[in-house]
Regions:
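Feature captures the catalytic ectodomains and active-site-proximal regions of enzymes
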Residues: 1-341
Length: 341
């Protein structure tokens, strides 16, 4: 494990996104104190801010005083690839990518096609892609009232059905309305003696992808998120714990650091399918050694190129089920710095 990770990658743990819901569940079900150093509570509100990585927040902490001054802060790592579909699946299932099988923004589905895990284009049945009970479903079965608050269009999305199923879904009509979100969160939190209310906030990530995380628009949205957190802290009932985290951070990519595979030295030779995302490519091929050698030669120090079997052996994705192995690339290209492919 160490030889692969030492080059560029941080090993997951000791606390990961996969551990978060089970950590709250320990207190909610009476199985023991909350894990990960979280406070014990009978009600948790769990706010997931898409795209608000630790380094991004630290850079603009002066714009988010409420977030910056929250107590009991702990570092969590996300498994690779650090992308929304994979990280939300880790959170919702309480499992690692090698188990839940949502291994990127796009990846090779069991059907053999490249599927998009956010839009679910070319996706197989969500319950087939991810058949295991989710962490939310396990809490519901244990008698915990679990609610999910987010945009209405996500209620029956493929990703929700695969990895976030189980909670009662409460749609948000106006994503910019702090009062609506706080009101619905309070109502959901009070709906059971033991409750977990999951609140998904996506706009910071949306702005970051469109404008960049150092843009004025991103900074403005971070201030809005901080306002939302402050409003929740002001209104939540005593004994209710607010847990805030992100699913990944963001890196701005300069135009001249975007590698176009069609224009670079035969990178597509012997490649059957190319999936993943610009910072973490799954490359599917019957000739992994030759393809990896070619990609290393062309990309140089712009990316770390590894054989998929080596990454699996290094436990990069956690233990990998036989049923999910074919979804990971035969070769992986993991960009360095601010490069993208």
């Amino acid at each position: 494990m160490s030889s692969l990770l030492a080059a560029d990658l941080m090993p997951p743990g000791p606390g990961t996104l996969s551990d978060l819901v089970p950590a709250m569940g320990q207190a909610l079900t009476g199985g023991g104190p909350a894990g990960l150093g979280l406070p014990d509570a009978t009600r948790y509100v769990f706010l997931l801010v898409d795209g608000m990585g630790q380094e991004n927040l630290e850079h603009f902490r002066h714009l988010a005083p409420t977030l910056s001054e929250m107590k009991n802060c702990h570092d969590l790592t996300c498994y690779v690839p650090s992308t929304t579909a994979t990280s939300l699946s880790c959170i919702g299932t309480g499992a690692v990518p090698g188990c839940h099988g949502v291994v990127g923004y796009t990846f090779r589905a069991p059907s053999g096609r490249v599927m998009n895990a956010l839009s679910w284009v070319n996706g197989d049945d969500p319950e087939v892609i991810q058949p295991h009970p989710t962490a939310f479903e396990s809490l519901v079965a244990a008698g915990v009232t679990v609610s999910s608050i987010g945009p209405a269009r996500f209620q029956r999305s493929g990703l929700t059905r695969a990895s976030l199923r189980g909670p009662r879904f409460i749609p948000i009509r106006d994503e910019d309305d702090v009062d609506e979100r706080v009101y619905k969160t309070l109502k959901a939190s009070r709906s059971g003696d033991a409750s977990l209310t999951y609140v998904y906030e996506r706009s910071l990530d949306h702005v970051g992808h469109g404008e960049g995380w150092q843009s004025a628009a991103w900074r403005s949205r971070l201030m809005w998120v901080d306002e939302l957190v402050g409003a929740l802290l002001d209104e939540l009932d005593p004994g209710t714990a607010l847990v805030v985290t992100a699913d990944h951070g963001m890196v701005d990519i300069p135009d001249d650091h975007r590698v176009m595979v069609e224009d670079e030295g035969g990178l597509l030779a012997d490649v059957a399918l190319l999936a993943g995302e610009p910072r973490f490519r799954h490359i599917y091929t019957r000739r992994p050694d030759e393809v990896a050698q070619r990609w290393r030669r062309v990309l140089g120090d712009r990316a770390q190129v590894v054989i998929g079997d080596d990454a699996v052996a290094a436990d990069l994705f956690g233990p990998v089920d036989v049923s999910t192995r074919s979804r990971f690339g035969d070769v992986l290209a993991i960009t360095r710095g601010d490069w993208a492919i």
